[in-house]
């Protein structure tokens, strides 16, 4: 098969550190750009006040659950394609790409239908008070996200498949296009042409008045953030799938590969199911945690929303490096190079711990200033929200060094196909540590949202230590691909 445009990185031969960083750097950059969606939404929605920020927190708990399950299933595509490529089974890798696309799309459509209907009930269960502005905002935002879920999933699929092949640059370029679109249209879709501070910042106040007089468009409010996200994700998804089926990323799936085969679905579910379950439990856990924080008041929920955006600045890069490690481990185990796979995990752990230590130390003196960026000073309860969010940086910040190592170790396990072990270890962070400690602190110790910040710190440290102990046992190094069986399995194009 022709792969003239193949941009994949060779991580199975020669030096390891440099190609691994070359592979991982675009993923990290892509994850940082991904944070751009949340930061832009939070920044502009923050101009609408505390209820609007709280609505994003309520909505995100459900949205995160939705995309976590689909995202978990795409891990199977990453693992199988990485290991098939390492073993030299290129045709089979392309077949897996088609099967993953069809299966995850079906899951997305099912989620969209069910989620749209159940959104009001879910918001009520999380703790949003029916009849309140925050409840109305959250319902509108979440329903729009459900309507456009397929576009989000398609981009996640393209990203996962390209990553497994070893091409991380193409998804980065598409993410850049998507985020740029989102950043440009966010302020207009959220605030419209009336009382939009963007015009004042650009020195074009007169233009604002003229546009509003001509159109009468005052923005969609919180719902505008959802519309901007779905549109920008959709553009990237369509371009990505076009590149995939024209063979421009190395993989060459055919239309025949889109017809689901029972054996392929079983393999996807077997490998991706535990990660989807893990992400589902995590998403549900975030939902439960949001409901617990709601007991401390709207200001606490708003501060949690800001802390979530701030933490994503570190969590997403850690996840990006972990996904790069996932590919390196998968391809090297596919090539039966166990020691090289193990060394990749150790090198990534050192890199992430070192970088995070520097970033956290730099952020410490500016905690309150950083928190204040995400809410308009002078709006209702803004000072309280900023105080809570700044405390998050001070209390939980140092633990993110451990979070980084924790994510790398999980990435190594997933790359080997040990997704069940990764599932258990990932779930324990939230359900064994963070949620119980938060609940005790809020209900019995009276610490309010501060108990959540302490719970986050304890959970990251404890989980990193537990996962490191498991990793050192070395039982994760067996290759999940049966080379003889998979290399000879017929496909629609054979």
What residues fall within each predicted segment?
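Transmembrane helix-bundle signature of multi-pass secondary active exporters and lipid flippases
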Residues: 27-79, 145-152, 266-331, 355-359, ...
């Amino acid at each position: 098969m022709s792969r003239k445009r193949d941009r994949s990185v060779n991580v199975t031969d020669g030096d390891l550190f440099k190609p691994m960083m070359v592979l991982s750097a675009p993923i990290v950059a892509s994850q940082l750009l991904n944070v751009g969606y949340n930061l832009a939404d939070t920044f502009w929605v923050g101009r609408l006040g505390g209820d609007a920020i709280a609505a994003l927190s309520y909505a995100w708990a459900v949205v995160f659950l939705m995309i976590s399950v689909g995202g978990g299933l795409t891990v199977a595509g990453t693992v199988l394609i990485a290991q098939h490529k390492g073993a030299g089974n290129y045709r089979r890798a392309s077949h897996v790409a088609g099967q993953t696309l069809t299966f995850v799309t079906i899951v997305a459509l099912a989620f969209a239908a069910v989620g749209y209907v159940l959104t009001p009930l879910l918001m009520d269960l999380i703790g949003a008070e029916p009849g309140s502005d925050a409840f109305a905002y959250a319902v509108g935002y979440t329903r729009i996200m459900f309507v456009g879920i397929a576009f989000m999933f398609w981009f996640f699929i393209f990203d996962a498949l390209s990553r497994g092949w070893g091409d991380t640059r193409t998804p980065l370029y598409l993410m850049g296009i998507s985020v740029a679109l989102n950043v440009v249209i966010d302020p207009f879709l959220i605030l419209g042409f009336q009382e939009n501070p963007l015009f004042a910042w650009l020195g074009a106040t007169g233009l604002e008045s003229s546009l509003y007089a001509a159109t009468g468009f005052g923005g969609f409010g919180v719902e505008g953030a959802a519309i901007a996200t779905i549109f920008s994700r959709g553009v990237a998804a369509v371009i990505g799938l076009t590149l995939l089926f024209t063979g421009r990323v190395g993989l060459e799936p055919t239309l025949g590969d889109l017809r689901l085969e029972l054996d392929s679905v079983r393999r996807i579910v077997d490998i991706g199911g535990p990660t989807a379950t893990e992400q589902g439990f995590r998403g549900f856990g975030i939902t439960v945690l949001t409901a617990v924080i709601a007991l401390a008041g709207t200001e606490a929920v708003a501060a949690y929303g800001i802390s979530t955006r701030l933490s994503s600045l570190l969590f997403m890069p850690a996840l990006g490096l972990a996904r790069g490690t996932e590919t390196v481990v998968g391809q090297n185990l596919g090539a039966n190079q166990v020691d090289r796979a193990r060394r990749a995990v150790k090198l990534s752990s050192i890199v992430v711990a070192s970088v995070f230590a520097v970033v956290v130390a730099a952020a410490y003196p500016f905690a309150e200033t950083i928190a204040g960026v995400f809410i308009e000073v002078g709006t209702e309860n803004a000072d309280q929200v900023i105080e809570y969010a700044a405390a998050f940086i001070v209390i939980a910040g140092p633990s993110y060094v451990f979070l980084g190592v924790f994510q790398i170790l999980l990435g190594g396990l997933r790359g080997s196909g040990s997704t069940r072990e990764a599932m258990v270890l990932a779930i324990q962070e939230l359900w064994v540590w963070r949620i119980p400690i938060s609940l005790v602190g809020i209900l019995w110790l009276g610490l309010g949202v501060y108990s959540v910040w302490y719970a986050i710190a304890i959970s990251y440290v404890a989980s990193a230590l537990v996962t490191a102990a498991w990793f050192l046992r070395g039982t994760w190094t067996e290759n999940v691909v049966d080379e003889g069986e998979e290399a000879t399995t017929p496909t629609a194009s054979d």
